[in-house]
């Protein structure tokens, strides 16, 4: 595992948009490989999807994930009176499977426990992230053929 003390978050700014697009693309390119599209078509589609996603969550806490001071990912969290909604967590490819995502989710779990709120999220049904969230204690709470709804409940005392 990477040194967790070198992991931090900062607020995303408009200047981060090129980096955020890079992170988003790194999570989507593989699934587009089977479409038979050119690289230009893939990039245009990803940019369109990225901009639509940006407009979908205007109220969320949009954070840049920093490791050793370098931007390595993004975390989108929507907090309301009933729950904490994890809208997105994504790391650049070379920073995945190093324990960084787990550390951030565990920090969010501590926040949820302190607030007495569940954490909810949606994940693509076929994504390896389903197993990641299950290992962290999330359970399936609904969904459809495309997306699973998952929930983590803080322990009650």
Q: Model regions: which residues?
A:
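Conserved N-terminal entry element of GNAT/NAT acetyltransferase domains
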Residues: 1-15, 154-157
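A short beta-loop-alpha structural element at the N-terminal edge
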Residues: 8-22, 29-33
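Conserved GNAT-fold acetyl-CoA-binding loop/helix
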Residues: 28-54
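Conserved beta-hairpin
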Residues: 61-75
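Conserved acetyl-CoA binding element of GNAT-fold acetyltransferases
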Residues: 82-93
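Conserved acetyl-CoA-binding loop-helix of GNAT-fold acetyltransferases
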Residues: 91, 97-110, 135
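Conserved active-site alpha-helix within GNAT-family acetyltransferase domains
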Residues: 102, 126-147
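Conserved GNAT acetyl-CoA-binding A-motif
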Residues: 112-124
């Amino acid at each position: 595992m990477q040194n967790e003390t070198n992991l931090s978050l900062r607020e995303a700014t408009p200047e981060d948009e090129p980096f955020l697009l890079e992170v988003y693309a790194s999570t989507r390119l593989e699934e587009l490989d089977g479409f038979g599209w050119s690289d230009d078509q893939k990039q245009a589609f990803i940019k369109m999807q990225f901009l639509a996603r940006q407009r979908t969550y205007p109220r969320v806490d949009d954070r840049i994930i920093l490791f050793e001071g370098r931007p390595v990912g993004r975390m989108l969290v929507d907090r309301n009176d009933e729950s904490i909604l994890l809208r997105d967590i994504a790391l650049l490819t070379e920073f995945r499977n190093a324990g960084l995502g787990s550390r951030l989710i565990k920090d969010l779990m501590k926040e949820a426990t302190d607030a007495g709120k569940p954490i909810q999220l949606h994940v693509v049904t076929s994504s390896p992230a389903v197993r990641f969230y299950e290992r962290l204690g999330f359970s399936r709470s609904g969904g459809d053929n495309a997306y699973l709804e998952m929930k983590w409940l803080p322990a009650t005392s």
